[in-house]
Each structure stands twice: as C-alpha cells, then as structure tokens.
Amino acid sequence: MKHTFLQVALGGALGSAARYGVNILAGRLTPGFPLGTLSVNIAGCLAMGLLAALLAHRGGQHLAPFLLTGMLGGFTTFSAFALDTMTLWERGEIATALGYVLGSVVLSLAAVIAGLTVGRGLFA
C-alpha cells in the first residue's frame, strides 16, 4: 500500500506539471479564455478512456494508481474548471461561461466515450 501512495504522488506531480505547462502555452494563445483547462480536461478524458481500456484488456491494473489516479488526476481538474467558469460569469461574460460549461461537459464525455471505444477496439 505504501508503494501505491508513492505511485499516485509521483503520477500526480507529473500530471500537475504537465497541466501547468499546457496552461502557460494556452494562456499565450487565448488570453482571457480558459483554453488550457478545457484542453487538459478533454485530452485527459480521452486518455482516461484509452488507458482504462488498455489496462483492463492487457492486465495492467497495477499501473492504474500511477497513470489514472496520479497522472491523469493531476493533469485534469474540475476545480479549476469551476473557478474559470465563475471568473467568466463575474466578468459579465455569461454566454461565454455557459458555453464553456456546456462545451466542457459534452466534449469531455465525448472524449471518454471515444477513448473507451478506440481503446476497446485496439486492446481487446
């Protein structure tokens, strides 16, 4: 169990650092819009689906704490999503905030579905 906590911690550190890098880059591309958070949530959901399918079909469940809980848990974030939404809302950008919520939820669910579908096809 001690090793599992270390796997989650290491994966979380790597995932969080990657998210930070994406947010810096995205902030330069689209100042004022939380493209970084949107991007990591969609990419992370796609990766979650793909890796969940891979680990389930290839017997790699021992990697789940590092990859899924740690790396992808650190990489994606819905707490930042909620804060970004409220920031847009409080700036009076109500339509943008609502579009961001709808786009984030729909695209993230679509990405998980795509990841699971592709992953099951590739790794079954």
Curated annotation (Swiss-Prot):
It comes from the Bacteria. The lineage of its organism: Bacteria, Pseudomonadati, Pseudomonadota, Alphaproteobacteria, Rhodobacterales. Na(+) is not transported, but it plays an essential structural role and its presence is essential for fluoride channel function. InterPro entries: FluC. This is Fluoride-specific ion channel FluC. Coiled coil: none annotated. It is found in: Cell inner membrane. Fluoride-specific ion channel. Important for reducing fluoride concentration in the cell, thus reducing its toxicity. It catalyses: fluoride(in) = fluoride(out). Keywords: Cell inner membrane, Cell membrane, Ion channel, Ion transport, Membrane, Metal-binding, Sodium, Transmembrane, Transmembrane helix, Transport. One of its GO terms (cellular component) is plasma membrane. NCBIfam families: crcB (TIGR00494), PRK14209.1 (NF010805). One of its GO terms (molecular function) is metal ion binding. HAMAP family: FluC. Signal peptide: none annotated. Pfam families: CRCB (PF02537).
